[in-house]
C-alpha cells in the first residue's frame, strides 16, 4: 500500500515529506533534515523541556486556531499533518531582530550555559501567544515542564515577570507599585543599581507575530481523510472517523493507539519495545467531544489533559461548590501532573488505559465513580471505573478490539465530600510515590457514613481500593473513633513487601494514613458549624493540615556595589554585563557540539556497556547487530592501535577486555550510518558473563577492606587531652548521598580523521581539552601534537566533564581512525547518568568534645567516600574534604582521616565543590548537635567557635581577610533573623501538623587546585590591523561566564571597548597544556594570563602612542604593524606560594578563601514530608566583583544546586549495582517552583581581594554549600515536630542523612501514624535499592 505525504509547516515554510517514518521524532527531523538546531535534546523523555516548540493547528470542534507547547523529543512527525511548528529560530534572531522574549531572558541574565534557554523561550512565547498579558502565576506555571541546571531560575522568572499585568518587575528601580521589593516590609535594604533596566526592553506587540499558514486555514472545511505512513519497522495509520478506527482495531487488535506519544514513545525508546502497527485517533470528533450531562461532564478519550483542565476550571467557576468536589480533586492532581508540554498532547483516555500503578488520576476516577464508555465494532458498554477495572499490572478490562470512547466525571452530590492527594519527590512535574482519591457520602442530614471510597496508586501493582477498611465504616459516624479504625485498617490492608519496587516502604504506608487524616480533617472543616454532636470538632492547630499548597508572591533582591563615580563607560569591570553569548543562546544560534552540521559520510557511534557490576566477559556476539540496516562495525579492545589503558592513573580501560567492574562499564561500541541504527545494533549485541562478587556500598567496602591507597590524615593539637577536658562528648554517624551533574547537554564528541600522519580533529564538550588530547593520542599510539581538540562551549559541566568526557572521546576517536570517516556520539541522558558517575557519597563517623558553654575543644572525623571502580579524582576530592572539615570554626585539637572506598559502581568524579560540601555538611551537623546538647541557640554556638582574622586553620594556613564575621552580621541583619525566629516559634505553637524552621550557616572555601602544578594558565592574543582583538585562553566556557569576564579583563587592560574583542573557542593548538576548567580558579588564573598578554601588547604599542598621543587604538596598531612589530603574544601565570605537605601539616593548600553566609526558612508538612522554601538571604564575599550579574548568577545557581544536593536529588541503586535513576522522570533536580519564594542575594561591599585579578574572587563553587542552610532549617522544623510528640524533649539528638527528601522528613516526624507503619525487613530480603 502506498504511503501518504506528510504536510506541515515549520516557521512559516511548507514541508512535504514523502517518506515519513513513524519512529522519527520532530526533534530529530528539525535538527537533521531541516538544520534547525536551536531545539535541543536534553533527555529524550519529555522531562527537561530543552526541546520545547510551539504547535499550532485549526481546532474543528472549537472553530479556532490553537497554540500549545510540546516536547519535540516525544512528538512523532506523523502527528504533525496540517500542523504549524514554530521553533526558537522562527521567532527572532541576532541577524534580524530578537523577539521580546529572547531579548528579556538575555538581558535579565537568565541564560548561563544556554542549553535550556531555547526551550524556556518557547514555553514563554507559547504562553504569550495565548495570553499576551499573563499573570505572574501563569508565567510560573508555564515552566513546570522546563529545567535549568545553571541559573537557579530567579533571573529567568524576574525577566519574564516584566510581561505580567500584575506585579511586572521593574528590575529593582522601585518605580512599580507592584514591585516584588515592596511586597515585604524591610527597611534594611540599600538598593543597588539594577542588574537590568526594563525600560530598555522592546514592547511586546501581539499583532507582529507570524500568522497561521493560510494554506492550512483554507483546509479547515475539507473533511480529513485516513492517512498511512510506512517506516522501516512501523506502520502508522491516522484514522479520521470512529468507524474507521473500530474497523482498524478489529483488523489489528494488537495495534497501539497513540495520541500524544508520551507513554508509548518512552517504551519504544527506553524499554526497546517495538509496536509494528500504530493507530492515531486524535482527529476523531467523538473522541474529542466534551458534553455536560445531567450526572457529570463527559470527555472524549482523546481530549488533551490541558483541555480537560480548562473545562473543569470553567465548571468550578460556574457551578455550585457542592457539585464540583470531584472536579476540584481532579484539578489538584492535574495541577502537578506534568508540564504544559505534556498536558497539551497527552490524552485523558491514554492516561487511564496506560494503567500505571502510580497514576495520578486513576485513583481519583476510581474513588469518584467515574463511568467509562467502551466500544468496539458492533458493541458499546458503559462500566464504572471501580476496583475490578485493573485486573493486574498494566492491564484493564478492555478486550483486544475495544477502545475507550469517553470518560464521564461525575458531579458531587449533597452531603458528599471528595479530596485528592499526591506525594512525590518534587512538587512540580514528578511521578507520584503515593497518590489517592477519597470520597465520603453521608446519610442525608447526618454525619453517618453512607459510602466511603479510599483508592490509592503506588501501593500495589495497580490502582487499588481499600475495600476491607471502607466497608467496615459504613453507618459509622465521622469522628475520632472512625479515624482510628480507618488508620488501623489501612495499615493492615495496604501492606507492602520489603522488596516492593520503588522502595520507601514505611514512607508509602504512612502516606496512606496521612492522606486519610488530611481528608478526615478537610471534611470536618467543610462541615464547620453544621457538625453534629457525634461528629468530631476540628482542633484549631490542625487547620493548616487541610490547606493545599499555595504559591506565595515572589520577592527577589540582588545587592551589589556599584562602580566608582568617574569610571569610564568603556570600562565594564564591575558592571552587570550580560553573558556575551546570551542573545545567541536565546535565539538558538549558539553552537554546541552536536549542533555542528553533519559531515559528508559521517557515521554514528553507540556504546555497548556492561549489565553486571563485576564479572568476567565470557563472549561477545555481534551477529544480530550485523543484521541491523546501516551497521558498519563493532569496536572492542582488540581494535585499539595504541594503549587500552586510560584514566588519570592508568587504572581504567577504553574498552573492558576480560573483566567488567561496574554496570555501565564500556565493553565496546557499534558504528552505523544513523544514530537510530547504531542504537538498535548496540542493543542486540549479546555479552555473556561469569559473575564475580561485587562491592556496592561504603559499608561493603569497609567490611571487605576494599580501599584505594592508604589513609589520608590531618591532625593538629592533642586529641586525647582535648576529649579528656571536654564537659560533653557526642559521637555519631552521618551519610550524604551522591549527586548527578545533570548538565543539560550530555557528553558529546565529533572526531574527524585528517588522513595524514595520524592527525585527528575533535570537537568535544569537555572541561579538559588537554587530557582529551593526551588520552586520545595514547589510545591511537600517536604523538600528542597530531591531535587537535576544540571546545566552543558546553551546555553545563559542573565537574562532570573534567575527566569523564574522555570515556566518550577515546571511543569516538577510535571509530574515526578505524573507519576513516567522521564519527559522532552524543550520549542519551540514561546512558550519561549510568556511565559517567557523579558526586561522591560520603559516610562520616565523628566524635566531638565541647564545654557546657558550647566551645568545641576536640574533634575527630573519619571520612569514607564511595570512589567507584577507578581512582579518577577521588584522592584530591578527599584531600579537599579534609581541608574543609572545620568549616569556619577554630578547633584546637582535631584529627580528620579519609579513605577511598573501591566499589563496583561507575567511577565517581569531580562535582562543583569537589568534596568540600560533604565535609562542610558533616561539620554543620555536629555543630548543630553541640548546640542542642548544650541547650543553646545554634547561631550562638556557631558564632562562639568562629575563627578570627589571623587565626591558623587545622592545616596551619593563616586566614587573611577573614570576612565571615562581616557576612554573618550583615546576614543576621538583612534576614531579620531574631524577629523571624520568634515568628517561627509562634507559628510552631499554633500549628500541629506544619512546622517551620530557620537556620543560618557560614562557609569558607579554599581557592586553588590542591595539586600545585595545575595552578598555571596560558593565554594568546592576536591584534589585527583593523584594531580588533582575538583572545584565546586555556579555559572553557560552560555557562559560568568565563569568556565574558576574560573579554572584560582584556578590555580594561587594553582600554578598548569590549566590542573590539572576541573569543572564539578553546583549542589545544592555541593554548597548549591547559589545566582543566575547574576548582573555581579559571577567572583568577586565565584572567591574570590575559592581563599579562595585554601588558606585553601595550608595551609594544607604547612607542607609537608616544609618537601619536592623539591617535586612536587603530592608529597605533597600524603603525606597529607597519613598523614590523609583532601584534601577537602569549601570557602566562602561575599561582605563587602553594604547596601543602600532609606529612608535616605545613605549607599553603590555597591561595585564598571565598566566604559567605546564608539564612533560610522553610515550612514542612509533617504528614507528607513535603516542604516549602520560604526565604533565603545570602551574603557573599566575592571581592570586587568583575561582573555582579554573572557573580550573583553563580551564587544563586550554586545555591540551588546545593539545595538539590541536600533536599531533593537522590540516586537509587539496585543491590546488584544497577542505577535505577537514569533520567528526569526518576531523578529530580530543583525546578522553578523549588527555589525560595523570597530569594535575596547581597555581594559584600568594600572587600577587595589583593590576590586575584582586579581584586576579584572566585565564585563558582563556594556558594553551593549554603544550600545546606535549607537542610538544617528542615531539621530545625522536624525537631519542633518531634518535640511536640515527645513531651517537649528539645535536647533529643536524631540522625537525618542527606538529602532531606519527603521520605526522610516524614519518617523523622515520628507520630501516631508512623508507629502504625513500622516495617521490619526479613534478613533474606533484597531491598529495591541500597544506600551506596
From Swiss-Prot:
Any Pfam family hit: MoCoBD_1
Expression across tissues: Detected in milk (at protein level).
The keyword ATP-binding is assigned to this record: no
Coiled coil: none
Ranges where the 2Fe-2S ferredoxin-type domain occurs: 4-91
Residues covered by the FAD-binding PCMH-type domain: 229-414
Disulfide bonds: 535-992
Gene Ontology terms: cellular component: extracellular space; peroxisome; xanthine dehydrogenase complex
Activity modulation comment: Can be converted from the dehydrogenase form (D) to the oxidase form (O) irreversibly by proteolysis or reversibly through the oxidation of sulfhydryl groups.
Main location: cytoplasm
Active site, renumbered: 1261 (proton acceptor)
Family annotation (PROSITE patterns): 2FE2S_FER_1 (PS00197), 2FE2S_FER_2 (PS51085), FAD_PCMH (PS51387), MOLYBDOPTERIN_EUK (PS00559)
SMART domains registered for this protein in UniProt: Ald_Xan_dh_C (SM01008), CO_deh_flav_C (SM01092)
PANTHER family: XANTHINE DEHYDROGENASE
Assembly description: Homodimer. Interacts with BTN1A1.
Family: Belongs to the xanthine dehydrogenase family.
Functional summary from the UniProt entry: Key enzyme in purine degradation. Catalyzes the oxidation of hypoxanthine to xanthine. Catalyzes the oxidation of xanthine to uric acid. Contributes to the generation of reactive oxygen species.
NCBIfam families: xanthine_xdhA
Protein name (Swiss-Prot/TrEMBL): Xanthine dehydrogenase/oxidase
Gene from which this protein is expressed: XDH
